[in-house]
Curated annotation (Swiss-Prot):
Protein name: UvrABC system protein C
UVR domain segment(s): 207-242
Listed GO CC annotations: cytoplasm; excinuclease repair complex
SMART domains, A to Z: GIYc, HhH1
Subunit relationships: Interacts with UvrB in an incision complex.
Length: 621
């Protein structure tokens, strides 16, 4: 249902024609920008409340002044409206909603499902067969967990392509963090037992694991296997030491603790997670707010958005009562396998957890505001150094990374006045240039970035300053790229490495040839260094990933008759390109979809042989 009034919007009239059913409403500005998404138990009553009387605050006044149309979606119940509201807020990011800003998916511990399971950190879609434990509140918690598992249980962490082609144990075995299943140092039965123990450990069943270790230790002693008994004893001692450090609740609770702090128009929500009584650590969120929301409203928005994406534990402790808590409990319980309880005003040990979360939220917010103030000072110093008229709202920096021209990747990082905007980072895989031609790579990356902005008319995504990691030559290429797509209003600055590549001695190069030497103590240069270093980091990580993928697949892709499916079958069968290269023609021909003739072609291509040489080799293999 839509009212298409071109200039003014009659909210009362629109509301009068709405249903009393539950649903979701959306408010739009004249340029079709989505201003706000909300849910309602009764659409008519909720929408009418915006237009009856004076708005409660300046934020609401400013928003309603921009509304030119609304539309609604009716749902079967209010819980369904809540879920739809969360989906729309996350996907459409309305200007006036409290937005949970988190650019990264949560980390999990992955235990793969194969003959010799691998354990590893995992982020992103869960497409690898195996069991996923988590999510954990942060990377530190996962790395600490994996560190402990490798030390105690010695499971492998290597990729299959490495595992299947080892001829001797790797360094992880030498330092006591892997049992070397790749070369059968450990028996399959013993490795499977270690996997079982890791599973108990990750499930939080440490008491059960301890009982099993005690029984196994007794059996080993009875059979006079004293070395095995000693290893089990040491494992049990380490496990108990870990329990004493990490367990804070003997009743082994699964719960999250949330607290919200707000100051000077900014907010921090702190999440403290416990699983099976074990403290998994904290994670801080800094939601985008409009400065006038109460902490209870911010916390309510966070809870609804966060747990719409991640499974909630049975118990969630809050530092205060939040709006719609009953509705949230019902919606979460309906989508979970257990009842979800939101609690505040708790006592005893749980009150201590809440107090700890509140204190940490306040400290985190104070630290963040201090960091933002310092960043604004540096940003202002850049403005003054470069002679810009207005404040800097957005800067970008490009960098190129490759290895002798292989797998060239360009990065583009984005900063605003208070720090990095990671959700807008971009990488560009460079193709169609002479390998190692950094000038052509830079020109291609900048053209691709700005051509899209021009085509989509995204003026707000154009930077005030575009930093180029390089000297006058790179700067000239960047200018050519901008001219090619018709962009003229962007200030270009080259960042040339200093004498002996020492930090603090960088030279800033302008298009007119002017050189600036701010010096190591300059706040402006500190800001520029941060941006440049981030561009370099982002480029090199992208390059390494592309190089690894290229080395795994490109040689096979160049062979006529090898498509994506056959290539995948080969890599899966042999565990990687090295395994394919080590195989004989007869072995290659056993792979699904590979004929004898194609196997000969593959063997010849990978070994640089002629057809006759390949035929002779086939008789040998």
């Amino acid at each position: 249902m839509t009212d298409n009034a071109p200039i003014t919007f009659d909210g009362k009239r629109f509301a009068a024609h709405l249903s009393t059913a539950p649903g979701v409403y959306r408010m739009y500005a004249a340029d079709d920008t989505l201003l706000y998404v909300g849910k309602a138990g009764a659409l008519r009553k909720r929408v009418a409340s915006y237009f009856n009387g004076t708005p409660k605050n300046t934020r609401l006044t400013a928003m309603l002044a921009q509304v030119v149309r609304m539309d609604v979606t009716i749902t079967r119940n209010e819980a369904e409206a809540l879920l739809l509201e969360n989906q729309l807020i996350k996907s459409l990011t309305p200007r006036y909603n409290v937005l949970l800003r988190d650019d990264k998916s949560y980390p999990y511990v992955l235990l793969t499902r194969e003959a010799w399971p691998r354990i590893a950190l995992h982020r992103g879609p869960q497409i690898v067969p195996g069991r996923y434990f988590g999510p954990y509140p942060g990377m530190t918690a996962v790395r600490d967990m994996l560190n402990l598992i490798h030390k105690l249980f010695k499971l492998r962490s290597c990729e299959d392509s490495v595992f299947r082609n080892r001829s001797r144990p790797c360094l992880q075995y030498q330092i006591g963090r892997c049992s070397a299943p790749c070369v059968n140092v450990v028996t399959h039965d013993n490795y499977t037992e270690a996997v079982h123990r890791v599973t108990l450990f990750l499930e939080g069943k440490s008491d059960l694991l301890a009982e099993e270790l005690i029984q196994a230790m007794q059996v080993a002693s009875e059979h006079l296997e004293f070395e095995q008994a000693a290893r089990l004893r040491d494992l049990l001692t380490s496990l108990r030491s870990m329990q004493n450090r990490q367990y804070v609740d003997g009743r082994a609770a699964d719960l999250d603790v949330l607290a919200c702090a707000a100051l000077s128009g900014h907010a921090c929500v702190l999440l403290l997670s416990f699983r099976d009584g074990r403290n998994l650590g904290t994670r801080m969120f800094f939601p985008k707010t409009n400065g006038e929301e109460r902490t209870a409203e911010i916390l309510s928005a966070f809870v609804s958005q966060y747990y719409a994406e991640y499974p909630p534990p049975p118990e969630i402790l809050l530092d205060q009562e939040i709006p719609d808590h009953t509705l949230l409990e019902a919606a979460f319980s309906r989508s979970s396998a257990h009842k979800i309880s939101l609690r505040w005003n708790v006592r005893g040990e749980r009150a201590g957890y809440v107090e700890l979360a509140v204190r940490n939220a306040q400290v985190a917010l104070s630290t963040e505001l201090t960091s933002q103030r310092a960043q604004r000072v540096r940003s202002e110093a850049v403005r003054q150094l470069l002679g810009l008229e207005g404040p800097i709202k957005r800067v970008e920096c490009f960098d190129i990374s490759h290895t002798m021209g292989e797998a060239t990747v360009a990065s583009c990082v984005v900063f605003d006045a208070v720090g990095p905007v990671r959700s807008q980072y971009r990488r560009y895989n460079i193709t169609g240039i002479t390998p190692g031609d950094d000038y052509a790579a830079m020109r291609q990356a900048i053209e691709r970035r700005f051509r899209r902005a021009v085509e989509e008319d995204k003026q707000g995504e154009r930077p005030d300053v575009l930093f180029i990691d390089g000297g006058a030559g790179q700067l000239a290429q960047a200018k050519m790229a901008l001219n090619a797509v018709g962009v003229e209003s962007v200030l270009l600055v080259g960042v040339s490495k200093g004498e002996e590549r020492r930090a603090g001695h960088e030279t800033l190069i302008m298009l007119d040839g002017q050189e600036l030497h701010p010096g190591a103590a300059s706040p402006a240069l500190q800001f520029i260094q941060q941006v440049r270093d981030e561009a370099h980091r982002f480029a090199i990580t992208g390059h390494r990933a592309r190089r690894q993928k290229t080395r795994m697949t490109s040689k096979l892709e160049d062979i006529p008759g090898i498509g994506s499916r056959r290539r995948a079958n080969l890599l899966k069968h042999f565990g990687g390109l090295a395994g394919v290269k080590a195989a004989g023609q007869t072995e290659i021909a056993r792979v699904e979809g590979i004929s004898t003739a194609l196997a000969a072609k593959i063997y010849a291509s990978l070994h640089g042989l002629s057809k006759n040489d390949a035929a002779n080799a086939s008789r040998v293999s």
